[in-house]
Amino acid sequence: MIRRINLSGNPNLGVYISVTDSVALIPQNTPEKFEGVLREALEVEVLKVSISGSSLNGALAVGNSNGFVVSNQAMDREIDALAAAGVEAVRIPERFTAVGNLVLANDNGAVASPLLSDDALQVIGDVLEVDVKVSTLAGLNIVGSMGAATNRGALLNPQASSEEIGIIEDTLGVEADVGTVNHGVTLIGACSVANSNGVLVGEETTGPELARIEEALGFLEG
């Protein structure tokens, strides 16, 4: 299911929400209406949490069905709250805290920014239980902000090179396409939230953009 919605007037959904096929980490002050739409569209358990005392869960965490890697500034109580809900979360040993902006992942693999250290790459691979490859996307280091990936497909920044697209397809084990959201915005990961069940995008996303998103993320099959 694909839905157009803003979070308290903000279309940058991927900055605030980190999602897998089973769980969504959303800000503690998320309105009930938005929470209901997310729960229905993505078919997930919703956890209202903070990371590093912040509402920027999408920027500060990346996960798949095996767990989440979070900012090294995440607090013990936040890690414990996730553990109590049955969600493993491990801090990344890295000075760059916005791990959600730097990693594109699904249950098959992870593509990580060249900015990340070998130790960070090891933790990502161990926690998510996937192979990790290093690449830019659209020539930029913020791989997670430049794309959205699920176990069904990936939507990438239109400036992605054929080499970058090939790396992402090989690593994540899905077909990828390029497109935009929110009427021409190329920061796909920062402006959308997607899993294998559905996708949320900002209210300004156009009809042609929706069609491309549905196709790229595998919602037009069969």
UniProtKB/Swiss-Prot annotation:
Coiled coil: none
Pfam families: eIF-6
InterPro entries: eIF6
GO molecular function, a single term: translation initiation factor activity
UniProt keyword rRNA-binding, yes or no: no
Source organism, top-level taxon: Archaea
Gene Ontology biological process terms, A to Z: cytosolic ribosome assembly
Presence of keyword Transcription regulation: no
Entry keywords, A to Z: Initiation factor, Protein biosynthesis
Family classification: Belongs to the eIF-6 family.
Entry function: Binds to the 50S ribosomal subunit and prevents its association with the 30S ribosomal subunit to form the 70S initiation complex.
Protein name (record): Translation initiation factor 6
Organism: Methanothermobacter thermautotrophicus (strain ATCC 29096 / DSM 1053 / JCM 10044 / NBRC 100330 / Delta H)
Taxonomic lineage from the root: Archaea, Methanobacteriati, Methanobacteriota, Methanomada group, Methanobacteria
